[in-house]
């Protein structure tokens, strides 16, 4: 039939062997903060405080993460998995490949965070199938332009030579989540070419993408000297 020459990619071997051209302009945001007792000794991030509706106050408890009562809109097909489980990482990578997603932007809460434990394995598995990994810098405790610079240095120094480390036009890509929490003029110290702690024209230069919540905030990205 018409699909007679189409290669099926049902298993690991098929994905590894197939001649796949991934779209490295298609990026997913990948959260590697989940844990479970069998791998990590406890549940992580499957539980969550219940958020109150606007205008309400008080303590309405939390979702326990136990007995399938998890903080998730849909129950995951892979169950309450651990982000440190190598088999889970392999399955996630292959889901991305089947969707032709070329880059995973992994959430980053700092060097000592639980999520950092799986970054090396994520990079290794991505490299096997030609996928790439970039980083999504979250509002970690103590985040400032200075500590963001320190984290950029750590990421580039630790992972920058890995074949799966994503670069575009020779530069790594970083997303800065909730960048509006810090004043644009403060960010400019880091991202302006003449800033006090600038990464520009250094080995830590990159493409830095901020976050706005409304159109009126778009000029703040330019003031911060971010790239988008």
Please tell me what each predicted stretch does.
Residues 9-228:
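Glycan-processing catalytic domains of CAZymes
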């Amino acid at each position: 039939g018409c699909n007679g020459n189409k290669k099926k990619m049902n298993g690991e071997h098929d994905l590894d062997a197939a001649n796949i051209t991934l779209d490295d302009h298609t990026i997913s945001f990948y959260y590697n903060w989940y844990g479970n007792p069998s791998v990590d000794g406890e549940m992580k991030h499957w539980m969550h405080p219940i958020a109150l509706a606007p205008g309400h106050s008080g303590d309405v408890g939390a979702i326990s993460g136990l007995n399938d009562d998890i903080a998730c809109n849909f129950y995951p097909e892979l169950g309450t998995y651990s982000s440190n489980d190598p088999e889970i990482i392999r399955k996630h990578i292959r889901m991305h490949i089947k969707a032709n997603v070329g880059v995973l932007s992994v959430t980053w809460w700092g060097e000592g965070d639980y999520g950092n434990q799986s970054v090396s394995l994520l990079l290794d598995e991505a490299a096997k199938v030609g996928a790439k990994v970039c980083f999504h810098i979250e509002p970690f405790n103590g985040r400032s332009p200075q500590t963001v610079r320190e984290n950029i240095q750590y990421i580039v120094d630790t992972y920058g030579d890995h074949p799966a480390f994503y670069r575009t036009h020779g530069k790594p890509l970083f997303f800065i989540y909730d960048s509006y929490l810090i004043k644009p003029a403060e960010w400019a110290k880091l991202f302006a070419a003449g800033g006090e702690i600038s990464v520009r024209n250094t080995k830590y230069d990159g493409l830095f993408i901020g976050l706005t919540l409304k159109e009126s905030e778009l000029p703040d990205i330019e003031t911060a000297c971010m790239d988008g």
